[in-house]
Amino acid sequence: DQTGLSQEETLRDADLIVLATPVDSIPMLAVKALNLVNEKQVVIDMGSTKQELSEIISQHPRRGRFVATHPMWGTEYSGPEAAKHGAFTGRTVVICDHELSDPDALVLVEWIYNTIGMPIKYMSSEEQDTHTAYVSHISHITSFALALTVLEKEREEEHIFDLAGGGLESTVRLAKSSPDTWIPI
């Protein structure tokens, strides 16, 4: 805490609150943020699953201040050290349940994503979760399964690395992803 402000004071002073944490913590953080925001502040999330979050905040009196988003970009790395300049440019962002967000909150978030060059798709939370499961989450599950199978069956690790070509390396790359991020998904 470099500012000397409490978490609540920091949230109250922010114009935009961005929740970019593992998905299992986002609903609780979203409720906490919505409990503190005023009619001018906006809360967004970056999580890859939306249905549970949508259900939890659906009846919140400040639901309109929330815009559910999922930027469709990531690597097997996580944390601030994984940041990459220009990573989001040209990548799609999904905005979920946009009709539940206040118009001014939605306009601000659309402006941010348009400014950094992200095409916007609009979907319901359910649609987003279904489509993302097929195009993103299944590839991670497959990568984890292959990596675990190879490590279990091929006991001599030096043979794995000596014999494996680019195909194995490419396929299991996602298995390096943080379990803290992927287990809740």
Where are these regions (language model features)?
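Rossmann-like NAD(P)(H) cofactor-binding subdomain of soluble oxidoreductases
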Residues: 31-81
